[in-house]
Amino acid sequence: MQEERRLAVLRAIVEDYVATEEPVGSKALVERHGLGVSPATVRNDMAALEDEGYITQPHTSAGRVPTDKGYRLFVDRLTTIKPMSTAEKRAIATILDGAIDLDDVVQRSVRLLAQLTRQVAVVQYPTLSRSTVRHIELVALTPTRLLVVLILSTGRVEQRLVDLAAELGEEDLADLRTVVNRAALGEIIADAATALRALVPAEDATPTGAVVDVLVEAMSDHRSDERIAVGGAANLARFGDSFDSAVRPLLEALEEHVVLLKLLGEATAGEILTVRIGHEGPYQELSSTSVVATGYGPGDEALARLGIVGPTRMDYAGSMAAVRAVARYVSRILDEG
């Protein structure tokens, strides 16, 4: 009973501190939250929470604020992630359903996450090396020039032009299209490239060799594996009182995409929604920063990560709900192709 009451007091302190940005006192807790006990009892509970390291007193005359340990207990004891409202779900669907390609999906997702959470949003582009081949299309632009289109399971589309040494008729083009699709369809990139290379001898000058060369080249392009989109940096203006401790280091991190990728990578394991709070992260200089992140991708496979980063004083419940909802919706879009 006592433990549950103290947890309720901690929950109230976290919610009030996030909402008001002010240290929280016992009188305010009793007035706002109807805890059913006297201010004296709440003060005793707050003293116990402080002794255990869950809250701290920033100034002698001030109320209490949560510590990283307090935020962690708060997050761990969230029995359910509150669902998005109907209006929020409708907004997510409206914004993301209008995307025309993978780049558009990523850019819309990062803007949406930043708006929903009022934090900095980070979305990693799907990793090419873990993609599978969905389709290969060959389009004759002229009898000696082809447009080769590689479509991956992530929704990524690669296009290459191929100039042929000799003319290629419609029937031969259809046969070639069948051959390359039979070799690569459904395979992960590395296996697809190997299968395609096996179709022709080295330095083959035939149309098949020319098409295989550009397909393998497209499959070897790993530039997108470390591409990320960032949005919502202006949201950090809300935390001006924490500029030196939280905002400045985070602004500097936004310039280093490798740092952001590591933050997302440290926070996520597959499609599990995870939270890293303050000192739990990999960078000491970002010890006042929290990360809420998860993986996304078609089916049950997480090909990339998305999430939000911000000062530890954040709405964890709301941020977790938004990150999970956007990831699920983006995954569905990629799954549907």
UniProtKB/Swiss-Prot annotation:
Q: Which GO terms describe its molecular function?
A: DNA binding; DNA-binding transcription factor activity
Alphabetized InterPro entries for the sequence: DeoR_HTH, GAF-like_dom_sf, HrcA, HrcA_C, WH-like_DNA-bd_sf, WH_DNA-bd_sf, WHTH_transcript_rep_HrcA_IDD
Q: Which domain of life is it from?
A: Bacteria
Q: Which keywords appear in this protein's UniProt record, sorted alphabetically?
A: Repressor, Stress response, Transcription, Transcription regulation
Which Gene3D superfamilies does the UniProt entry name for this protein? Answer: 3.30.450.40, Heat-inducible transcription repressor hrca homolog, domain 3 (3.30.390.60), Winged helix-like DNA-binding domain superfamily/Winged helix DNA-binding domain (1.10.10.10)
Function text: Negative regulator of class I heat shock genes (grpE-dnaK-dnaJ and groELS operons). Prevents heat-shock induction of these operons.
Q: Which family does it belong to?
A: Belongs to the HrcA family.
Its recorded name reads: Heat-inducible transcription repressor HrcA
User: Its encoding gene is what?
Assistant: hrcA
